[in-house]
Amino acid sequence: MFKGFQKPKRLVANTETLTERYGMFTAQPFQRGFGTTIGNSLRRVLLSSIEGAAITAVRIEGVEHEFSPIPGVVEDATDIILNLKQIPFKISSDGIKTVRLSVDSHGDVRSGQIETDADVEVLDRDVHVATVSEGGKLNIEMRLKSGRGYVSADKNFDEDLALGYIPIDSVHSPVRKVNFAVEAARLGQMTDYDKLTLEVWTNGAVSPQDSIGYAAKLLKDHMTIFINFEEVPEQTEEISERGMDKMNEVLNRSVEELELSVRSYNCLKNANIQSIGELVQKTEAEMLRTKNFGRKSLNEIKEILANMGLSLGMRIDQHGRLVAPPPSAGGGPDFGPEDDGQDQIGE
């Protein structure tokens, strides 16, 4: 039922720009339309469903409600709470954790001054929290909890919340931003495939690579209930599907990557053969009719292609996939699926 349905073989990361908080990834080729389907699905799950830590309640000494001013502190409780929400945390254990911030000297108060235990990490230690005036002080207790997505202050209210704690709304997602783009991809002679590019920004609690993995696993787990049949492995005929997939990976590569001699490469260039996919579809007879192309160049190309699991005289179907070559015609050799690709031409 799904034979010939094109799917990407791997996800490729841009290693030049990859960091702990940013990653750009590409996957291709998808059947037309599936780049958008997969990209949009991953984006929605990445932004809404990856688990992360956030402050769910705050207790500020001398403050009864979130609109109260704080003696000796420039900001009021509302401003301080807004600043606290910007601090990214990472929790390595289950349950609720409590962290504290105590300042009794004047100056700028930063997130790096928060006191934590071994299970809690402040991922950005330079977030501004408050400004304490001369003679002022600031004492804050914060409750941290793991969760997913947005949680309102009402849902963060617990019956066991100690007196003086103010429940606040929280955003738990460690993924800050996701972009995706879909453009045309080429496979062999076919150009109606999709290439998906995905960009992910996180707060450092989870890497971009891992966040994509978690999102894909969530989607997979939700989709399995819709499969109402046993999957039957695809039967191979003349050439195994695994072998064909490996061959297809090199079709888009330029003939420049074959490291041919200058003479052989120039002959291919003059014949307007630019990709390996175009080359393998040529027969020996066709190649020998190329201007200045002789037996030595032919044997060189055959040897290099054989080392890659390819040969001359192969066919590419309408999906851009290699299929077994037909019996030879017009003087070309017959390379069956079990052929080792060595020169069989008699002199």
UniProtKB/Swiss-Prot annotation:
Similarity comment: Belongs to the RNA polymerase alpha chain family.
Region (Alpha N-terminal domain (alpha-NTD)): 1-230
Name of the gene: rpoA
Pfam families per UniProt: RNA_pol_A_bac, RNA_pol_A_CTD, RNA_pol_L
Function of the molecule: DNA-dependent RNA polymerase catalyzes the transcription of DNA into RNA using the four ribonucleoside triphosphates as substrates.
Coiled coil residues, start to end: none
HAMAP family in the cross-refs: RNApol_bact_RpoA (MF_00059)
Keywords carried by this UniProt record: DNA-directed RNA polymerase, Nucleotidyltransferase, Transcription, Transferase
The organism of origin for this protein: Solibacter usitatus (strain Ellin6076)
SMART domains: RPOLD
Catalytic activity: RNA(n) + a ribonucleoside 5'-triphosphate = RNA(n+1) + diphosphate
GO molecular function, one term: protein dimerization activity
Class in the EC hierarchy, top level: transferase
One example of a Gene Ontology biological process annotation: DNA-templated transcription
CDD domains: RNAP_alpha_NTD
Domain notes: The N-terminal domain is essential for RNAP assembly and basal transcription, whereas the C-terminal domain is involved in interaction with transcriptional regulators and with upstream promoter elements.
Summary of subunit composition and partner proteins: Homodimer. The RNAP catalytic core consists of 2 alpha, 1 beta, 1 beta' and 1 omega subunit. When a sigma factor is associated with the core the holoenzyme is formed, which can initiate transcription.
Bias-annotated ranges (Acidic residues): 336-347
Stretches for region Alpha C-terminal domain (alpha-CTD): 247-347
Region (Disordered): 320-347
Protein name from the UniProt record: DNA-directed RNA polymerase subunit alpha
Any single GO CC term annotated in Swiss-Prot or TrEMBL for this entry: cytoplasm
